[in-house]
């Protein structure tokens, strides 16, 4: 028996590959499916099932491509209504994989189709719970994402989640290992631990949402308080996971179309494509293609793309390090941005050598800003979170959190000069 968590840090997402006696199952796979196929090939195993815990909002699953390439059956729990061929399991139904058994445990609340998979060994002992977004380490799934689909309020979904946890999960044995779909940094919860697995017994002791003396009213208040608005791309990812999408092979072929500086310029002017520069921010600031935006690939790339580029169908032209184009196209596709239509061959250096127009960002010190402010009225945009701004901010600065900068730009006077202020780091 093999249980492998395949964790992707930039999405704080855990997929799972489980193999026994020549058969395997993959749970909540990412968009690129080769890693799972390679593992099965190395084990001499066939992938029998692709288990989905729910229709994911924060990433596009690889379930459809993986099923096509491996012959596996896609399985969802009760209430799921996908537009493609899949098996909808009943609560309590069991699936054999080699010498292992997986039991479907329907746990509505995060979404109404949310389902956990209880793993039993050859002797029938319960050894693992693949809990999706129902139960995280230190937290539970937020109950506000499926309100429209479920025709329920977040309070009603929270009540449903409370019942699922108390009736379906908490009665299970303490020594079961919990394998969640996400860890710290995911927007699917608000207080996740940096740990990515734990025993259920320890979670009963330390996870606020599993407190034995907690009333339903207390639970509802706790899980619905302090929820930040979800990223705009979440419902679009749900739709793709439910209705289907282009194969990752098509997306990669389209995105890796090399364009000379001249052809790149024509494409930018004629297609309305967004120019996305994924180089290091410090390098970008020294020179970039006019009208491009910078989201560095070495960081929480996909979530920031989702926050700053509201339309997943937006055509994208890439400026990237030449040896990382495939990586960038793949990471965009993970969150549903499938319409990369080409990249600048030779990178920004080729653009510069071709004598094309170049923009730059000027950085100044706090002392320089203070000196300017002493002489004239200036306009400062503080792009930190509102909580950071309220804690302390530069006098007369206007708060425009980066997560919602598109909305803030509607209020910006294009005839004024703005000084942008942020804390240090990737953001």
Task: Go through each PLM region and give its residues.
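Metallo-beta-lactamase
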Residues: 111-230
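Active-site neighborhood of phospho(di)ester-bond hydrolases with catalytic His/Asp-centered motifs
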Residues: 26-27, 47-56, 74-79, 106-109, ...
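Divalent metal-coordination and catalytic microenvironments
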Residues: 18, 28, 54, 66, ...
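Cytosolic catalytic domains that perform sulfur/thiol-centered chemistry
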Residues: 158, 171-173, 187-427
């Amino acid at each position: 028996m093999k249980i492998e968590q395949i964790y992707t840090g930039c999405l704080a997402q855990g997929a799972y590959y489980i193999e026994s006696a020549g058969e395997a199952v993959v749970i909540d796979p990412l968009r690129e499916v080769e890693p799972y196929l390679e593992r099965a090939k190395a084990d001499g195993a066939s992938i029998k099932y692709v288990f989905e815990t729910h229709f994911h909002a924060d990433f596009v699953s690889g379930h459809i491509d993986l099923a096509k390439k491996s012959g596996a059956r896609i399985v969802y729990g009760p209430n799921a209504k996908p537009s493609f061929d899949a098996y909808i399991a009943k609560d309590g139904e069991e699936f054999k994989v080699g010498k292992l058994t997986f039991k479907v445990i329907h746990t509505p609340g995060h979404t109404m189709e949310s389902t956990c998979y209880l793993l039993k060994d050859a002797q029938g002992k319960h050894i693992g719970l693949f809990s999706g977004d129902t139960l995280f380490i230190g937290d539970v799934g937020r109950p506000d994402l499926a309100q429209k689909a479920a025709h329920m309020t977040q309070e009603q979904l929270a009540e449903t989640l409370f019942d699922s946890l108390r009736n379906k999960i908490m009665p299970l044995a303490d020594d079961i290992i919990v394998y969640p779909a996400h860890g710290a940094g995911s927007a699917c919860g608000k207080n996740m631990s940096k740990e990515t697995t734990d025993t259920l017994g320890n979670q009963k002791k330390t996870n606020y949402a599993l407190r034995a003396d907690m009333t339903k009213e207390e639970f509802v208040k706790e899980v619905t308080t302090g929820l930040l608005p979800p990223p705009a791309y979440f419902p679009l990812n749900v739709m793709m996971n439910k209705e289907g999408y282009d194969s990752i092979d098509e997306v990669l072929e389209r995105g890796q179309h090399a364009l000379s500086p001249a052809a790149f310029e024509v494409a930018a002017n004629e297609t309305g494509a967004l120019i996305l520069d994924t180089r290091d921010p410090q390098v970008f600031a020294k020179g970039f293609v006019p009208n491009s935006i910078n989201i560095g690939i070495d960081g929480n790339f996909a979530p920031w793309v989702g926050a700053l580029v509201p339309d997943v169908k937006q055509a994208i032209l890439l400026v990237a390090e030449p040896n990382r184009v495939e990586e960038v196209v793949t990471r965009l596709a993970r969150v549903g941005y499938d319409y990369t239509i080409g990249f600048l061959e030779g990178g920004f250096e080729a653009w510069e050598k071709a004598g094309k127009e170049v923009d730059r960002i000027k950085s100044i010190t706090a002392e320089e800003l203070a000196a300017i402010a002493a002489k004239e009225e200036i306009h400062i945009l503080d792009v930190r979170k509102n909580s950071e701004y309220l804690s302390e901010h530069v006098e007369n600065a206007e708060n425009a959190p980066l997560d919602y900068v598109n909305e803030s730009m509607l209020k910006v006077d294009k005839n004024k000069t703005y000084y942008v202020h942020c804390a240090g780091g990737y953001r």
